[in-house]
């Protein structure tokens, strides 16, 4: 179930303040955040936000088509290493 429309989208206040402060600067440093739950607003477009995946911050460049999604959608938390397969080398028949 999604979020109620009457509540509106959510973004952490500290993240909004950092993005607004960065819009005034010419040089745009990477913004570090742990807030994977924040919704991407149109004001975020053009910013690079480093989102925490549980062990490191992964930089994400915000584009037009990302607006409305959550930051955590673009940084997976789990690494898929593949399913177990037949190991032909060790079967000693």
UniProtKB/Swiss-Prot annotation:
Origin superkingdom: Bacteria
Pfam families noted in UniProt: Ribosomal_S19
PROSITE patterns: RIBOSOMAL_S19
InterPro entries (alphabetical): Ribosomal_uS19, Ribosomal_uS19_bac-type, Ribosomal_uS19_CS, Ribosomal_uS19_SF
GO molecular function per UniProt: rRNA binding; structural constituent of ribosome
GO CC annotation terms, alphabetical: cytoplasm; small ribosomal subunit
A GO BP entry: ribosomal small subunit assembly
Keywords assigned by UniProt, alphabetized: Ribonucleoprotein, Ribosomal protein, RNA-binding, rRNA-binding
Keyword ATP-binding part of the UniProt annotation: no
Family: Belongs to the universal ribosomal protein uS19 family.
Function: Protein S19 forms a complex with S13 that binds strongly to the 16S ribosomal RNA.
Annotated protein name in UniProt: Small ribosomal subunit protein uS19
Species this protein is from: Pediococcus pentosaceus (strain ATCC 25745 / CCUG 21536 / LMG 10740 / 183-1w)
